[in-house]
Amino acid sequence: MLLIPSFTANSNEPPPSKLSLSDLSMAILKSHFFLLFPLLLLHFHTVSFAQTLFVFGDGLYDAGNKQFLSQNRVDASFPPYGVTVGQATGRWSDGSIVPDYLAKFMGIPKISPILLTTADFSHGANFAIADATVLGSPPETMTLSQQVKKFSENKNKWTNQTRSEAIYLIYIGSDDYLSYAKSNPSPSDTQKQAFVDQVITTIKAEIKVVYGSGGRKFAFQNLAPLGCLPAVKQASGNVQECVKLPSEMAALHNKKLLQLLVELSRELNGFQYSFYDFFSSIQNRVIKSKTYTFETGNAACCGTGSINGSNCSAKNVCAKPEEYIFFDGKHLTQEANLQVGHLMWGADPEVIGPNNIRELMVLPLDITVILAGIQEAMAAMRPRQSNIESLYDIKKMESEMDNHWLYQVDKAISFMI
């Protein structure tokens, strides 16, 4: 069963809303309804609800892979991790993580870690693992390339159609930039850009590998303001302010990542995506914690030091994790993960675009073919197309797309199904 969650009270992000067409878009759609409707009906047979979720990333999405790969003690396999749900499961939180909630909203079971060989993978697999990076070869983890390779090795567990209809959820890069900032405290603008380009180029290559295996629907959660993580602030010695360089690197990454997704949507036939502004969501909650139901956005629930930025253990955990954004120095509480899950699932374009995941999962696989035909037939009548060149100006991007009538047809299709 498909679940439609409600939003957490007091959130400034808009809740899911029904389709709102601009006057111009509505006029065009009405006047050309008889031209468009047969085309839409002709292709409705390709529409189906995604029932499979593949997850790639780092500790924010790790459902337990670290405990199967590491030769050392994995903290997430022991209390106080899992304290809110009664047991530690290898998740770096007091309870559920974002992929768990998205699976729930999709109406499927939680997605198991791929290294749990006895698991049921009929609805997908989770390849994410703590400490994962895009670049390099860190020990006891899997880089993005290694995660994608593991997916390729196991892809025959799923049919071609299943892989093409699935959602591919990705969050990775934090550890790359945290390591870079630690090793390069004063890089030039050119050096910063060069490193970001390396990361983005690798992500592009791995997206294309997944695309080559049938992947079409990609959901990206952009990077958090890394300098605001309790672990990073505490290590800097100034716990009252976010550290500039890690957050700056994350913002540069997010800009380039959005540009990449726009580029791929033009280059790869059938490529569809969601881009969630996680950076702003966390930044807003750190600055205005109480607005989002949290008591503090500065300190972690579990750990040692002035803001609990390190060494989370059962001896130093808070009584009410739900009052905190961060459970440990780098990872979110279940409550924060729930809010993020809601936003990714059903928020408006100011938060996630051009589709939220609820819309992405029902988009026809050949929607680009439909829209391309309509676009060609009515090119002279449409408003200007959006020209997304500024990477991290999501509100500008979505404002322009909201005036693009083809974008409205896209939305109309998903809501008519």
Swiss-Prot record:
It is found in: Vacuole; Endoplasmic reticulum. Gene3D superfamilies: SGNH hydrolase. Pfam families: Lipase_GDSL. Disruption phenotype: Defects in endoplasmic reticulum (ER) protein export and organizational defects in the ER, including aggregation of ER around the nucleus. Increased sensitivity to salt. GO terms for biological process: endoplasmic reticulum organization; intracellular protein transport; protein exit from endoplasmic reticulum. Keywords: Endoplasmic reticulum, Glycoprotein, Signal, Vacuole. Its main location: other. Induction: Up-regulated by methyl jasmonate and upon pathogen infection. The keyword Signal applies. GO terms for molecular function: hydrolase activity, acting on ester bonds. InterPro entries: GDSL (IPR001087), GLIP1-5/GLL25 (IPR044552), SGNH_hydro_sf (IPR036514), SGNH_plant_lipase-like (IPR035669). Glycans are attached at N160, N308, N311. Expressed throughout the seedling, rosette leaves, roots, inflorescence and imbibed seed, but not in pollen. Residues 1-50 form the signal peptide. The keyword Protein biosynthesis does not apply. Interacts with the PYK10 complex and TGG2, but not with TGG1 or PEN2. Belongs to the 'GDSL' lipolytic enzyme family. This is Inactive GDSL esterase/lipase-like protein 25. It comes from Arabidopsis thaliana.
